[in-house]
Amino acid sequence: MQKYVDYGIDALDAYTNKSIGVSNASGPKSMSASVGDLLRQAVTDQMDGFLARHQDYFKGIVENGREISLEFKRFDGFEYYFNDDVEFKGREMEFSSLIRRYIGSIAKNKNFSFNPGENNIDVSQIKIEMEIEEEDLFEEGKFDMVPNDAKKFADKISRFIKKQFGYPSKVSTIGLGKARITVGSK
């Protein structure tokens, strides 16, 4: 009786949980090979294409930025809603519009999905630089390139909100590629 192996491999981006490479195939048929040998041969036959998809995905991240998502919430005790007007540089606009513009000014791309509401804002498909420059706290005048992630990006937005309006906010992570900014205090 001939034996063969069907298999499926799916590689996921740890930041977005999106599939970046899939390989489904059947291995060669054999009367005498062990299951381990059949599996090894089946995977080896498809590995070059699978790894090429990984490399293309990584090149895309380097060129276009790493994808993250943000979630904005407001504490119930916070006196403002995200669709309330605020003044910024002599202009009145909804707080959510200002957030959208600020994200666009610091993201690698300005093409992201923005879904505002009065109590929450969901932002997805934001592209950020893979690395950012950060001051070395132990060596004066020295800066290092460090990995960037959703929390560091959200921290920057949180500091902007506090500096411009005095609104406190709390940043929490939801995995590597997603962060929540809760505005106001309890």
Annotate the PLM regions.
Residues 2-7, 63-67, 121-123, 176:
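Extracytoplasmic
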Residues 18-110, 149-159, 175, 183:
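C-terminal/domain-edge helix-coil "capping" segments
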Residues 11-13, 72-74, 130, 183-185:
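Flexible glycine-/small-residue-rich
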Residues 106-173, 184:
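C-terminal soluble interaction/assembly domains
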Residues 1-2, 11, 24-29:
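Short N-terminal edge-element motif at the start of the domain
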Residues 1-10, 17, 158, 166-168, ...:
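A short, hydrophobic beta-strand-centered structural micro-motif
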